[in-house]
C-alpha cells in the first residue's frame, strides 16, 4: 500500500504540473497521513535536516564556480585550446565538443550547465561549417552528460550523502569511466565524420596553439587543483568547492579581467537560484526517504529481490534495468534521492562493491538525461541549437546506443571501474 500511495502521489503530482520537489513533499504528507503520524512540525524539521549537511555545502560552491567560469571567460578559453589542437581534422569541431565537455566536466559537475556552455559556443560554428546540426547537437549533448561522472560531480555529492559513502572515493572512481565515455563518443564521431565527408577548419600554427595554451592554462589548472587536493587529502569535497569558486573568481577578475561587479552580481543571483532549486529538491526528497524507511519500503524491496541475492550479477542487472527505466522518465537528482535508500541495503547484502554501484547508478541516470521521452539535456540542446525535440532525438540516437553498450560492458567487466580506482588510490 505504501508503494501505491508514494507512486500515485508522485506521478499524480507530476501529471498536474507540480515541480518534482513539491510532488515529493506531497508524497511525504500522504505517507504521514497513511502512517497516522502527520505533524507539520515534524515535516518542517525533517525538511530542514535534509539540507543541513556539511557535504551538501559543496553544491553551491561548485555551482558558483561553474557560473563564474561561463561569465568570466574561462569556458571559452577551455574550448579554444582543443579547437587549435584538433579543429583541423575532418569533423574536428565534433572532437572539440567532446574534449571541451570533458574538461568542463572537471570544473562544473552539472550536465545541464556543461551542455549549455559548450553548445552555445560550438553549435553556431558547426552550423556555419555545414555540419548536420542534429547530429552535432546530439554529440555535444552526449558529451555534456559526462559532467556528472568526472569529478567534481554534484550527483556524486548527493549520492554520497544519501548512502553514507565517501564522496572523495566516488569522485576518484568516476575519472576512468568518464574518460572511457569520452573516448567512446569520439570514436563514434570519427566513424560518422568519415562517412559524412565533413569540412576541415584551418590548421592552427604553433604560435596560435602556444598562445591558446598560455591563455587557457589558468582555467586548465583548476581541475589539477581539485583532483590533486582530493588525492593528497588536502581538502574535503566541500573545501574543494570553496577553493574552486575562489580560484575561478580570482582568474576571472584578476587574470582575464572579464568579471565586473555588475556581472558578478548576476552570477551570484544565477548561482543562488540554481542552488535553491537543488537544495529544496534534496530536502523534499529527504522527507519522503525518511517516511519510506518508516513504512519499511526498503525491506519490501529486499524481500521481493531476496531470491536474487545469491546471484549478485543477476541482481545487479535487474537493478540497472530498474534504474534505466526510472531514469528515462525522471531527472537524475530525484532518481538518486528516491532510489538510493531503497537499493543500497540490498546492494550491501549481496556483496556488491558500493562505490562501483554508485558510479554505475550515476552513469545510468546520466544517460537517461539524453534518452526520450523526457531527456532534460535533450531539451537544453534543443533550445540552444534551435532544433525540434524530434530532430534532437534522431541526432542523439547513435550516441545513446553506444553509451548504453558501454554501460553493459561495465556491468560485465566491473574491473574497468574498480581497478583504476585502486591504481589512483
Curated annotation (Swiss-Prot):
Q: Which family does it belong to?
A: Belongs to the TRAP transporter large permease family.
In Swiss-Prot or TrEMBL terms, this protein is called 2,3-diketo-L-gulonate TRAP transporter large permease protein YiaN
What NCBIfam families does this protein map onto?
dctM, PRK15060.1
Q: Which membrane topology describes this protein?
A: Multi-pass membrane protein
Give a GO molecular function annotation for the protein.
carbohydrate transmembrane transporter activity
Task: Say yes or no: keyword DNA-binding present.
Answer: no
State the organism's lineage: Bacteria, Pseudomonadati, Pseudomonadota, Gammaproteobacteria, Enterobacterales
Oligomeric state and interaction partners are given as:
The complex comprises the extracytoplasmic solute receptor protein YiaO, and the two transmembrane proteins YiaM and YiaN.
Where is the protein situated, by its record's location annotation? Cell inner membrane
Q: Keywords, A to Z?
A: Cell inner membrane, Cell membrane, Membrane, Transmembrane, Transmembrane helix, Transport
PANTHER family (UniProt xref): 2,3-DIKETO-L-GULONATE TRAP TRANSPORTER LARGE PERMEASE PROTEIN YIAN, SIALIC ACID TRAP TRANSPORTER PERMEASE PROTEIN SIAT-RELATED
Major subcellular location class: membrane
State the function annotated in the UniProt record.
Answer: Part of the tripartite ATP-independent periplasmic (TRAP) transport system YiaMNO involved in the uptake of 2,3-diketo-L-gulonate.
Task: List the source organism.
Answer: Escherichia coli (strain K12)
Output one GO BP term. regulation of single-species biofilm formation
GO cellular component terms, alphabetically, are: membrane; plasma membrane; tripartite ATP-independent periplasmic transporter complex
Show the stretches that span the lipid bilayer. Answer: 3-23, 54-74, 93-113, 139-159, 170-190, 209-229, 235-255, 277-297, 314-334, 355-375, 399-419
Amino acid at each position: 500500500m505504501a508503494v501505491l500511495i508514494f507512486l500515485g502521489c508522485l506521478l499524480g503530482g507530476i501529471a498536474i504540473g507540480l515541480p518534482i520537489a513539491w510532488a515529493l513533499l506531497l508524497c511525504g504528507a500522504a505517507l504521514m497521513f497513511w502512517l497516522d503520524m502527520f505533524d507539520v512540525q515534524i515535516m518542517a524539521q525533517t525538511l530542514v535536516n535534509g539540507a543541513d549537511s556539511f557535504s551538501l555545502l559543496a553544491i553551491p560552491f561548485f555551482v558558483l564556480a561553474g557560473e563564474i567560469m561561463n561569465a568570466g571567460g574561462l569556458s571559452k578559453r577551455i574550448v579554444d585550446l582543443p579547437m587549435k589542437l584538433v579543429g583541423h581534422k575532418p569533423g574536428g569541431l565534433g572532437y572539440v565538443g567532446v574534449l571541451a565537455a570533458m574538461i568542463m566536466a572537471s570544473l562544473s559537475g552539472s550536465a545541464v550547465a556543461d551542455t549549455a556552455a559548450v553548445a552555445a559556443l560550438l553549435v553556431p560554428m558547426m552550423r556555419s561549417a555545414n555540419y548536420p546540426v542534429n547530429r552535432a547537437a546530439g554529440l555535444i549533448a552526449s558529451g555534456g552528460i559526462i559532467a556528472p561522472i568526472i569529478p567534481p560531480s554534484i550527483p556524486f555529492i548527493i549520492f554520497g550523502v544519501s548512502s553514507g559513502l565517501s564522496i572523495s572515493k566516488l569522485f576518484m572512481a568516476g575519472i576512468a569511466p568518464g574518460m572511457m565515455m569520452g573516448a567512446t563518443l569520439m570514436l563514434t564521431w570519427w566513424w560518422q565524420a568519415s562517412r559524412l565527408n565533413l569540412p576541415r577548419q584551418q590548421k592552427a600554427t604553433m604560435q596560435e596553439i602556444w598562445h591558446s595554451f598560455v591563455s587557457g592554462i589558468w582555467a586548465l589548472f583548476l581541475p589539477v587543483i581539485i583532483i590533486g587536493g582530493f588525492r593528497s587529502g588536502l581538502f574535503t569535497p566541500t573545501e574543494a568547492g570553496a577553493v574552486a569558486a575562489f580560484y575561478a573568481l580570482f582568474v576571472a577578475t584578476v587574470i582575464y579581467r572579464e568579471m565586473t561587479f555588475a556581472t558578478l552580481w548576476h552570477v551570484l543571483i544565477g548561482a543562488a537560484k540554481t542552488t535553491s532549486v537543488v537544495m529544496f529538491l534534496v530536502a523534499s526528497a529527504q522527507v519522503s526517504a525518511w517516511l519510506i524507511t518508516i513504512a519499511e519500503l526498503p525491506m519490501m524491496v529486499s524481500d521481493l529481490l531476496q531470491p536474487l541475492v545469491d546471484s549478485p550479477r543477476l541482481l545487479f542487472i535487474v537493478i540497472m534495468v530498474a534504474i534505466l527505466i526510472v531514469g528515462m522518465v525522471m531527472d537524475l537528482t530525484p532518481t538518486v534521492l528516491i532510489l538510493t535508500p531503497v537499493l543500497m541495503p540490498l546492494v550491501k547484502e549481496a556483496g556488491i562493491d558500493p562505490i562501483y554501484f554508485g558510479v554505475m547508478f550515476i552513469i545510468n541516470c546520466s544517460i537517461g538525461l539524453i534518452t526520450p521521452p523526457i531527456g532534460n539535456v535533450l531539451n537544453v540542446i534543443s533550445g540552444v541549437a534551435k532544433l525540434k525535440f524530434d530532430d534532437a532525438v534522431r541526432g542523439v540516437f547513435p550516441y545513446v546506443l553506444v553509451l548504453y553498450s558501454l554501460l553493459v560492458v561495465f556491468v560485465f567487466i566491473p574491473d574497468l571501474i574498480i581497478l583504476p580506482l585502486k591504481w589512483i588510490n
